Amino acid sequence: MKPREVAFLLVLLFLVAIGFIGAYQMHFQPVMPVEPFESALGYPWRLLVALYVFLVLIGTAAIASAGELLRVRELEHVLKEAILIAIVTIAVGLVTIAVDLERVERGSYALLGHTNATSVMYWMIMFYVLELLFLILEGWFVFRSDLLKQSERKGFKGFVAKIISLKFLGKFFAKQNKDLDMSFARAIGVLALLTAVLAYSNLGALFSATHIPLWNDASNPVYFVITAVISGSAMLIFAIIVTSWVKGEDSGKLEALPILRKVLLFSLLSASLFVLWKSVITGYPAISAEGSYSVQNLLFGKFALNFWFLEIFVGIIAPVLILLFFGKNMDALFVASFLTLVGIFAFRIDFVFSAQVVKKISGVSIPTSVHPFEAMFAVGALALALLLYYVLYKLLPMEVEHEA
């Protein structure tokens, strides 16, 4: 390994260790006890909830599965990257929400003995677990033929390929049939796509089911699906370009950029209409005083800088202008994708926190804050996602393309 790679891995491992320390402390020392009083300080849904929403709504899997289902040749070139990113982000996202619960081991009692099939949160978790399982199975069929080729090599990568391909179990798993593998992958991809849409929309429905005015909106399921497409297309563009810079340009993968650029542009324009609609409808004082107060916090209050600069300008206006006028330039496309991801992350933070800012009996609102343990784990979780993607990318046969 090159010295830069070693340094990069050491930094990631250090950040993951910091995140582990934060998670360990949160497990034994709750950072914000939930008080059942109107005068309670703090917010029950905090930074890790926002991070969870950000991670699990990176919809690379939906874009890839849709491209595979519709036989879009350009998107099939980046199918492996899309599946890998989705698996990593959903897995780390589920770990994040588990840490936010602080005593997640108690969840087994509720799941096994007191399952509530009418709970929106129950189905949200189930859909994401199912999506993760479908993605792993779809990925296995997509990678299988290339894993069998890689298993013929000597060394650690060959050993890993033998294990993942299940070649060691006998001749049945050692047979190569690329067309059959891709047929299975497409069939499972349909299930993964349906489950992904259900998971994204169900997560939006979870917020809609609350009494909080800024969240209590029937359009949230659709809006969450749109933002998942935004995150997924931006993340794929970002990953493809960074990989091309590090490993050299791959003409097959770069062919996906024009389509992803269009997907990102139209989804950003759709999201801007939703932002305008939600701001007017929810913020109109005659509809809901509490909802109007939350929107005022976004537009003119303590979240105004986040909303106008990070969400609107950095996350929507700047990327749209770049995509419209400089979208064919790869460097500009990289900047647009990065700005979009920053804006989406800011949106998740604002969406979770600002809705919970309400006036108390005293007439004042409680200031938002992030516990140091939460911040430590959030940094560690993002580092863990990057580390897992890097390691899996190095071990798996990413460069071998399949035929459409």
What are the language-model segments listed below?
Residues I90-E105, F173-D181, A346-S362:
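Hydrophobic alpha-helical transmembrane segments of integral membrane proteins
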Residues V6, L10-Y24, V72-E74, L112, ...:
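Long, contiguous internal "core" modules enriched in hydrophobic/ aromatic residues
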Residues Y24-E35, G67-L79, L101-E105, A110, ...:
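Juxtamembrane/interface segments at transmembrane-helix termini
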Residues A61, V88, V95, E102, ...:
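Residues within alpha-helical transmembrane segments of multi-pass membrane proteins, especially transporters
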Residues M1-G59, A66, S354-Q356, E403:
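N-terminal signal-anchor module of multipass membrane proteins
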Residues Y43-R106, V120-F127, F134:
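Membrane helical hairpin/interfacial module
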Residues W277, L305-F309, I317-A336, L341-V357, ...:
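Intrinsically disordered cytosolic tails
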Residues A110-H114, Y293-L299, V357-E374:
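Short, membrane-exposed interhelical loops at transmembrane-helix boundaries
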